[in-house]
């Protein structure tokens, strides 16, 4: 269990484009993960990238395989 603090950012008010937030997250996107003086932007993006490409070529199941699953009942 890691202690953390959630700070809400009001996107409708443009709080993610304010200089204070841009100092934490230069792209002005959400989320921004900060641990002391260390911003974890690259680590968060790496996890996101891994989730996006979890079933591409080279893995046990590919996206093409998943796309054909709804039609397998017609083959049986």
Swiss-Prot record:
The lineage of its organism: Eukaryota, Viridiplantae, Streptophyta, Embryophyta, Tracheophyta. One of its GO terms (cellular component) is cytoplasm. It is an enzyme of class 2 (transferase). Belongs to the GST superfamily. Theta family. Keywords: Cytoplasm, Transferase. It is found in: Cytoplasm. Its EC number is 2.5.1.18. GO terms for molecular function: glutathione binding; glutathione transferase activity. It comes from the Eukaryota. It catalyses: RX + glutathione = an S-substituted glutathione + a halide anion + H(+). Residues 41-76 form the GST C-terminal domain. This is Glutathione S-transferase. Residues 1-40 form the GST N-terminal domain. Conjugation of reduced glutathione to a wide number of exogenous and endogenous hydrophobic electrophiles. It holds the Pfam family GST_C. GO terms for biological process: glutathione metabolic process. InterPro entries: Glutathione-S-Trfase_C-like, Glutathione-S-Trfase_C_sf, Glutathione_S-Trfase_N, GST_C, Thioredoxin-like_sf.
